[in-house]
Amino acid sequence: QEFIITARDLKQQKVFRESTIRSLFDEILRGLRIVHQHKMLHLDIKPANIFITDDNRSVLIDFGAAREVLSKEGNFIRPMYTPGFAAPEMYRRDAAMGPWTDIYAIGACIYACMQGYPPNEAPQRLEKDRIAIALSRLRGIYSDNLIEVVEWCMALDPLSRPQSVFALQKELSRESERRYTKLTMGEKVRLQFDTMVADTKKSVKGMPGLGTRQR
């Protein structure tokens, strides 16, 4: 999974400060709110589709999967989706999609900015959800408010998520929260180490003859 693109073509640190996350996604949500006001859904929000300009403004790109909201007749073509950032309802033919579907992806993007890697795919979460446990390890690094916002956005039940971009914007812009959390070197090393271990486990599991005990 490619990470957030920058106009300078520089590799950004995988882990973002809370103040940076709030600032970036405030701008992204402004653009997404306009999309939703035109009765459209993006449906492919992911870090690779977030472009950061030279003056550090964030822009949502690639509307190739964008579709109109369900009509009264229910005619709707299911778009392609990106595992980890696609909401559970995108995997089901009979599920209604709406602003809450894009909001799930926003939460997944914020999660990726905090952890340095994407969350588990929705079907995996439906079997065994580890999101809350993973986020709990970030308490003290990020504010409780930001962690709760991500959990809210990534609720498996669409009705348990913010139902509009405005509701999410309001919560994400709360001035009373600790917005300038800085990661210490030790915290950065720990997060990067955790990522390396997770990637190694995935690589070993995928190698023939490894990851399972031979008899």
Language-model features: locations:
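Protein kinase catalytic-loop region centered on the HRD/HxD motif
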Residues: 28-40
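Conserved HRD-motif arginine in the catalytic loop of eukaryotic-like protein kinases
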Residues: 161
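Activation segment signature within eukaryotic-like protein kinase domains
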Residues: 24-25
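Conserved activation segment of eukaryotic-like protein kinases, specifically the C-terminal portion
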Residues: 75-90
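Conserved end of the kinase activation segment
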Residues: 89-100
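Conserved C-terminal C-lobe helix
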Residues: 141-156
